[in-house]
A protein has these predicted regions:
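Short S/T/G/P-rich N-terminal loop/turn motif that feeds into the first structured element of a domain
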Residues: 1-73, 82-100
Length: 100
């Protein structure tokens, strides 16, 4: 069964938004890397002083392996992520009659 992972990364959202355009190729490579190690779905959202990440992964272990990459951690900081650890919520993905 897959898992949903929601991460709240505090940081500079203007810098992050700018990086989405200026470093689009790097974001695309990271997406391909995540798919290669068990990432199924991914979305970003921007709030007041934070970036929200909503992912679906094959397992929590796959997500943890992906996030442990030092190059990814450096990239997060470069695109506006605060040095403090993000808030992470993990839940088992379930199927429901109202799913769309």
């Amino acid at each position: 069964m897959s898992v949903l992972v929601i991460g709240k990364f505090k940081g500079d959202t203007a810098k992050f938004s700018q990086a989405l355009t200026e470093r689009a190729g790097e974001f695309a490579k990271i997406a391909e890397s995540s798919k290669a190690v068990g990432g199924l779905h991914h979305r970003f959202g921007i709030g007041d002083g934070y970036v929200l990440v909503v992912d679906e992964w094959e397992s929590v272990e796959h997500f943890q392996t992906f996030m442990a990459d030092p190059e990814l951690q450096a990239f997060i900081g470069e695109v506006g992520g605060a040095p403090e650890p993000p808030e992470i919520i993990v839940a088992e993905a379930i199927t429901s009659p109202d799913q769309f």
